[in-house]
Amino acid sequence: MRSGVFVAVLVVVVFALLTQGQELHVPEREAVANLAARILKIVHAPHDAAAGVPHKRNSELINSLLGISALMNEAGRR
């Protein structure tokens, strides 16, 4: 799945560069190269390492997105 995402992002970046390559300045080109390198690092990393991305359980992700952890901490203090 990660390979598919990488290929899709890479295709989008390549097409964007081909169509607007003359409009990109040096900082923008460096940003594109940096993002491509990060995506490549994530794709080629072992599944459990995920290139230094901290592992969170699904419940932790949901709670952090909904802000439930802050509410639970406040409720626990009462």
From Swiss-Prot:
The modification Alanine amide is found at A75. One of its GO terms (molecular function) is hormone activity. One of its GO terms (cellular component) is synapse. GO terms for biological process: chemical synaptic transmission. It comes from the Eukaryota. Eyestalk sinus gland. Keywords: Amidation, Cleavage on pair of basic residues, Hormone, Neurotransmitter, Secreted, Signal. The pigment-dispersing hormone causes the migration of the distal retinal pigment into the proximal end of the pigment chromatophore cells and thus decreases the amount of light entering the retinulas. May also function as a neurotransmitter and/or neuromodulator. This is Pigment-dispersing hormone 2 peptides. The gene is PDH2.
